[in-house]
Amino acid sequence: MKSLNRNVKEVSFNVVDQKWIIRVVDSHDPHMVVDGAVCRGCTWVGQSEIYMSNELTERTFKRVLLHELVHAWLFATQMSVPDAFNEEQLCDFFAIYSEKILDLANKIEQRFFSNEDNSSI
């Protein structure tokens, strides 16, 4: 199992033509605490930022990253209204964006777990 490249602190990327930044931070960073609970990942849609804990294994990192990227995509596509989001919309969202989200997650994971220092995708 690979470990995080400590030289890479953040990676920038685009979601539907919106610039986003993902940062790996200490698990007790203020951005990682929501309603008093420490999170493994957190998406701040107003700032177009995703924060990930530096204590995650590669496998857990990928799962949490995918979860947070879905939040970003929902916000960027304006589909993030929970009361109005039904099963058909969920299936459409998955059909339209799942390959793009997975492809981006793979690229981000490679940046954080390789020896490359490039911080942009």
Predicted regions and their residues:
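Metalloprotease/metallohydrolase-associated module, dominated by Zn2+-dependent proteases
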Residues: 1-59, 76-121
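Active-site recognition of the HExxH zinc-binding catalytic motif
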Residues: 63-75
